[in-house]
Amino acid sequence: MWGALRSALRPCCRAAVPPQRAYHGDSVARLGTQPDSASSTYQENYEQMKALVSQLHERAQYVRLGGSEKARARHTSRGKLLPRDRIDNLIDPGSPFLEFSQFAGYQLYGDEEVPAGGIITGIGRVSGVECMIVANDATVKGGTYYPVTVKKHVRAQEIALQNRLPCIYLVDSGGANLPRQADTFPDRDHFGRIFYNQAIMSSKNITQIAVVMGSCTAGGAYVPAMADENIIVQKQGTIFLAGPPLVKAATGEEVSAEDLGGADLHCRKSGVTDHYALDDHHALHLTRKVVRSLNYQKKMDVTIEPSEEPLFPADELYGIVGANLKRSFDVREVIARIVDGSRFNEFKALYGDTLVTGFARIFGYPVGIIGNNGVLFSESAKKGAHFVQLCCQRNIPLLFLQNITGFMVGRDYEAEGIAKDGAKMVAAVACAKVPKITVIIGGSYGAGNYGMCGRAYSPRFLYMWPNARISVMGGEQAATVLATVARDQKAREGKQFSSAEEAALKEPIIKRFEEEGNPYYSSARLWDDGIIDPVDTRLVLGLSLSAALNAPIQRTDFGIFRM
């Protein structure tokens, strides 16, 4: 997919390696050192991360099954392909599928399992065009929409809108989950937003294609009705605002689902659908033909260079980072294992050194990287804001590698203006219109999450490693703060606050923060776009950058920076 090129630039070593003379002719230095794989720290990190990755793959495999074995058997007995098989038959042979939010709904509804939130979303290449694919999974609760299903569908549309990706909806759904209608129907970002988004995207020439491969009931009927072009499968796909039971209850009329809203009715009489498919395979073949007719040409605002593999194996990331967030690591070692040729043109290397900034390429795409090497000081924040401005001026996408405890606190730092300096970085990140991608490779705490482009700052994509943690602060810190408040309250009342009382107060707080900071807790609620194996980071970033560059890069306008 991407070409390869090796250069003869001499490596510029760091850290444990003696420094080399800098040559002005070398525009970009090589990063990375060979880790001591025999060290106890490396081996402990490796084993811990390997265990987390094994758990990730095991859970992902279970989610990929979809509904129960009985539900899957019933689905295929009707001549239907399973939703993941539909996607495999839709995308170009041998091309990757960048799936989002695999763990949506994970342990979210108690004993009620909703694998992948009952819907599969991701970017795949169809007839050479990168498309957003949204596929209902009818083996999971009949494909009905839980609150998390709606959220995941709407998030997929948001990604499509931001990156100007044609949308393909593989429809097979019973509509809203009625027992949970209060959390799926009335609010701004509930079920109706799906159709609103379709209308808005169509108005912006972002193609909407619907393939009706099963039930399409009630409000869900608007998915094909509002599509630019649609397809329906005979004796399988149905579209109606009210199904046979509701029609009978409302009017007394008895009618079959096929007669009420089948392929013959909608292709021959109502005109609701455009193409008549004989089965799933035929429908997907027709879909590929529709995409081929879009006359789509991708125009990118960046220069692309031939791709190079990093100089270091990706699995060394396991030994470098590990699961213990209290153990520090140099983010440059992470960068060296994901960027082309391990080349990194560092910016302001000697200033604000707890924030690493610089330019690199990933699969030939230019990227400005911002990575954490400790707490953010005023110098780090000002450096980060400056670098964001450079990337916006040059139309270079931004990659944030988050491992941040937050901004530095204390009287001296407040006096030096940490609040206004941190605000500069937060404002720059908020205003930046270049594509922003965030990977949480360690901790993501407090205002550091904001400065490093957390979810609230609209990164095009946000991924987490399985060792990551996200929270307003660490559990120990939160427990200590609340214990201090309780002790002060007792003191005002003239009472003692015993160590036993303090321990009893702190224990559940620490436990709760640990649970809520877990990446699966985050992913279940769509605070991210997926948990990824560190080894896959480079590929995921390459696919994400490629998708993001379907949209023209807009000019960035910054507001007031308090000096």
From Swiss-Prot:
Q: Which gene encodes it?
A: Mccc2
Protein name as catalogued: Methylcrotonoyl-CoA carboxylase beta chain, mitochondrial
The segments labelled Carboxyltransferase in the record are: 49-555
Q: Which subcellular locations apply to this protein?
A: Mitochondrion matrix
Task: Tell whether Transit peptide is among the UniProt keywords.
Answer: yes
**Pathways involved:** Amino-acid degradation; L-leucine degradation; (S)-3-hydroxy-3-methylglutaryl-CoA from 3-isovaleryl-CoA: step 2/3
| Principal location class | mitochondrion
Q: Where is this region: Acyl-CoA binding?
A: 343-372
Task: Please name the top-level EC class of this enzyme.
Answer: ligase
- N6-succinyllysine PTM positions read 70, 141, 433, 495
A GO biological process held by the record: coenzyme A metabolic process
- Give the catalytic activity: 3-methylbut-2-enoyl-CoA + hydrogencarbonate + ATP = 3-methyl-(2E)-glutaconyl-CoA + ADP + phosphate + H(+)
* PROSITE patterns membership: COA_CT_CTER, COA_CT_NTER
